């Protein structure tokens, strides 16, 4: 018993190829050129997708996540307790920290007994997913709506942001405290 194997296409995209001779017009490729011109003309009248940055700024999504910032409380103390949940939740493993015990003369700097002596985010690894913000029980880290994610630079060391670049400036913390008290 002989079985014949037919050329069956599983995807449905298989086409039969013909080797027929081209006509004179087809050999001049006029039909293909006209089709290409029609596509070009169609795109010419569409709405432009490019903008003239920085004169025009594209509107960001309401769920946009920008630059990282470590929050301070109303008294200017850092919220971070170096629990490490942000580092554990980071899928890119971009966050590293070293915990330290607060000394008696540092009560005005840190809220809890334990604080992050070293807190670094490697911006070359960060994917701005926001999981660190969600994992933090003290609401110490958040992603701002700043449109400048990471300033350009040529040296890798400048992309590892330490507490000097991440901690919220004192004047902004005081403004936030005044806004909370006003509400």
From Swiss-Prot:
Q: Which cofactor does it need?
A: [4Fe-4S] cluster
**GO CC term, one of those recorded:** plasma membrane
Q: What UniProt keywords are attached to this protein's entry?
A: 4Fe-4S, Cell inner membrane, Cell membrane, Iron, Iron-sulfur, Membrane, Metal-binding, NAD, Quinone, Repeat, Translocase, Ubiquinone
Which residues does the UniProt record annotate as the domain 4Fe-4S ferredoxin-type?
71-100, 117-146
Please tell me which top-level EC class this enzyme sits in: translocase
Q: Which residues bind [4Fe-4S] cluster 2?
A: 90, 126, 129, 132
Disulphide linkage map? none
EC assignment: the record states 7.1.1.-
Function of this protein? NDH-1 shuttles electrons from NADH, via FMN and iron-sulfur (Fe-S) centers, to quinones in the respiratory chain. The immediate electron acceptor for the enzyme in this species is believed to be ubiquinone. Couples the redox reaction to proton translocation (for every two electrons transferred, four hydrogen ions are translocated across the cytoplasmic membrane), and thus conserves the redox energy in a proton gradient.
NCBIfam families attached here? NuoI
Designated name of the protein: NADH-quinone oxidoreductase subunit I
> Source species, please?
Flavobacterium psychrophilum (strain ATCC 49511 / DSM 21280 / CIP 103535 / JIP02/86)
């Amino acid at each position: 018993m002989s079985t014949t194997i037919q050329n069956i296409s599983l995807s449905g995209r298989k086409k039969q190829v013909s080797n027929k001779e081209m006509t004179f017009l087809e050999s001049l490729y006029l039909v293909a050129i006209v089709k290409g011109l029609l596509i070009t003309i169609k795109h010419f009248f569409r709405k432009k997708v490019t903008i003239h940055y920085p004169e025009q700024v594209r509107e960001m999504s309401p769920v946009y996540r920008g630059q990282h910032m470590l929050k301070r409380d109303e008294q200017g103390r850092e919220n971070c307790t170096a629990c490490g949940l942000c580092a554990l939740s980071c899928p890119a493993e971009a966050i590293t920290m070293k915990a330290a015990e607060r000394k008696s003369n540092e009560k005005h700097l840190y809220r809890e007994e334990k604080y992050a002596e070293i807190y670094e985010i490697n911006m070359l690894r960060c994917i701005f997913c926001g999981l660190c913000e969600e994992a933090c029980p003290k609401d110490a880290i958040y992603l701002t709506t700043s449109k400048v994610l990471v300033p350009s630079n040529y040296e890798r060391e400048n992309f590892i942001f330490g507490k000097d670049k991440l901690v919220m400036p004192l004047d902004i913390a005081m403004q936030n405290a005044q806004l909370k008290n006003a509400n």
